[in-house]
Amino acid sequence: MARKKIALIGAGQIGGTLAHLAGLKELGDVVLFDIADGVPQGKGLDIAESAPVDGFDAKYAGASDYAAIAGADVVIVTAGVPRKPGMSRDDLIGINLQVMEKVGAGIRTHAPNAFVICITNPLDAMVWALQKFSGLAPNKIVGMAGVLDSARFRHFLAEEFQVSVEDVTAFVLGGHGDDMVPLVRYSTVAGVPLPDLVKMGWTTQEKLDAMVERTRKGGGEIVNLLKTGSAFYAPAASAIAMAESYLKDKRRVLPCAAYLTGQYGIDGLFIGVPIVIGENGVERVVEVEFSAEEKAMFDKSVASVKGLVEACKGINAALA
């Protein structure tokens, strides 16, 4: 049986980490694409030379021509400019929109049947634009945001409660920006909701609020520490979890930026919501009930995404 083919558009920090994880998890053969000739080839060779030590069989190729992604089962897009200290994700919109246009054309021509995961920021607007540029069916393209944001929240909670991260579940919905919505009511430790843990004296409401705020600012915290780039280990791990659910038809319920057609009262936007990812891509959008306060936060987040999408239309008339 032929191995699956995973194409990685962008061979920077996230792209290289994705390539390594895809091999370690034996998800398939990997093609690294980057416009910086030599970088994808070098990283691919380096990882291939680690395979005998780690004990996995996967072919690695590097390329600077989109023809190399032909027939890919999964395409993960990280191409674009990362954040620097003092920048918001939204500051990247002009330059990364141009990148999405080129990437979309490459996917449309060479990998029109792939399941596509977009990581490029500002995420919710870039995945929207990439769908338009690529012509992909909306169920075959998603944005990586909620898995990462939820993982950050889970890490902070596990540290606070001194329990395994495996026993902490968390839901972060909405746009991948400062208005994201960590849903405390739907987040649990071993099935016990966080509000109950506050009542039990495990933590205080103030500490919980601080963790929610730290989650919202989680990406910026790392940008400010690194000074020369943005997070890459956790974003790569998050995208690999999504790719694995598709390739293995695991049907995991994961918060992702998905195309909505009336769910949550939204039509025609990619917004972070819980979805089921299986062999057909987005198999189902899970609609959870919001309290009035949660709905207000979610609506604010959606308004931010709408603003970014309108900005994209203003920059590129083809999207209007």
UniProtKB/Swiss-Prot annotation:
Lineage: superkingdom: Bacteria
Ligand binding (substrate): R83, R89, N121, R152
Assigned keywords, A-Z: NAD, Oxidoreductase, Tricarboxylic acid cycle
One MF term in the entry's GO annotations: L-lactate dehydrogenase activity
Gene3D superfamilies: Lactate dehydrogenase/glycoside hydrolase, family 4, C-terminal (3.90.110.10), NAD(P)-binding Rossmann-like Domain (3.40.50.720)
Substrates-to-products reaction catalysed: (S)-malate + NAD(+) = oxaloacetate + NADH + H(+)
Known EC number: 1.1.1.37
EC top class, as a word: oxidoreductase
CDD domains referenced in this protein's UniProt entry, alphabetically: LDH-like_MDH
A Gene Ontology BP annotation from the UniProt entry: tricarboxylic acid cycle
Pfam families registered for this protein in UniProt: Ldh_1_C, Ldh_1_N
Protein residues bound to NAD(+): G10, A11, G12, Q13, I14, G15, D34, N96, I119, T120, N121
Catalytic center residues: H176 (proton acceptor)
Family: Belongs to the LDH/MDH superfamily. MDH type 3 family.
Summary of the function given for this chain in its UniProt record: Catalyzes the reversible oxidation of malate to oxaloacetate.
Name used for this protein in its record: Malate dehydrogenase
Taxonomic path: Bacteria, Pseudomonadati, Pseudomonadota, Alphaproteobacteria, Hyphomicrobiales
Encoding gene, per UniProt annotation: mdh
